[in-house]
A protein has these predicted regions:
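Non-transmembrane functional regions of envelope-associated proteins
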Residues: 1-127, 165-229
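Short intrinsically disordered coil segments
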Residues: 99-100, 153-157
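Active-site Gly/Thr loop motif
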Residues: 130-154
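Surface-exposed ligand/attachment interfaces on beta-rich extracellular proteins
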Residues: 156-165
Length: 229
């Protein structure tokens, strides 16, 4: 039950959970177990959202942190950028990917510093390229065939002990649904549909490997010029 799961999360000490944010709905203050993971208000340029759904208090209170998994596709349905900080309730809510990277580097959010708008964020000694809206544009890694871009294990193989010994040791482990059932959540990356946990993995990988795409300062005026033509 929830009590056993909460005890396991607390014992591990390295489990981060996700909240879901929406642009509509009734606003409510962040609960304390979410607010403790937040950063200072990132300003009006950051993505501002209206409502949120959080983990139940018994789990959120014992988690190492709670972050968001929000990613809004462009008009063509493709996900090209991910907000590393959302603006909600006058604070910056970090993405689950940012919390995972921060923890893997043995750092805290006190080590996160905003640089100039054109330079992004600095997490300890790691530079993370973002735009003024604190958006990361991952350099999407896509395998050349139908194979998964990142190693995957079924939950059943982990729980019953048939997963290879040590396969999770020293790794950032992301847990998420990867069903192909009709109606399952998916995002379009490049030319294919991927599950939200894969988008999360791409963001983590881009930050750790320094593979973010930097948008030059002249990109937006050029876009306007092309559209004007």
């Amino acid at each position: 039950g929830d009590a056993l799961l909460a005890a396991s999360i607390q014992r591990a000490g390295n489990v981060f959970l996700a909240s879901r944010y929406e642009s509509t709905g009734a606003a409510a203050p962040l609960p304390a177990y979410v607010r403790r993971s937040t950063a200072p208000d990132p300003g009006a340029a950051a993505t501002t959202l209206q409502s949120a759904q959080h983990p139940i208090p018994s789990l959120g209170a014992v988690a190492a942190g709670v972050g968001h998994v929000y990613a809004e596709p462009d008009n063509d349905g493709r996900v090209r950028q991910i907000p590393l900080l959302l603006r909600y309730d006058s604070v910056g809510v970090p993405s689950l990917a940012l919390l995972a990277v921060q923890h893997s580097l043995h750092l805290g959010l006190d080590d996160l510093r905003a640089l100039d708008a054109s330079e992004g964020l600095r997490l300890g000694g790691l530079n993370i390229p973002t735009n003024a809206g604190v958006m990361l544009r991952p350099r999407w890694q896509v395998s050349g065939d139908s194979a998964a871009t990142f190693p995957t294990l079924s939950a059943a193989s982990v729980l019953d002990g048939t997963a290879p010994a040590g396969s999770l040791k020293g790794k950032i482990v992301l847990v998420g649904e990867m069903t192909d059932a009709p109606g399952a959540a998916a995002a379009r990356v490049e030319e294919r549909l991927v599950h939200p946990v894969e988008v999360l993995a791409q963001a983590v990988s881009s930050m750790r490997l320094g593979l973010g795409v930097v948008e030059p300062a002249w990109a937006m005026p050029v876009t306007w010029l092309v559209l004007a033509l």
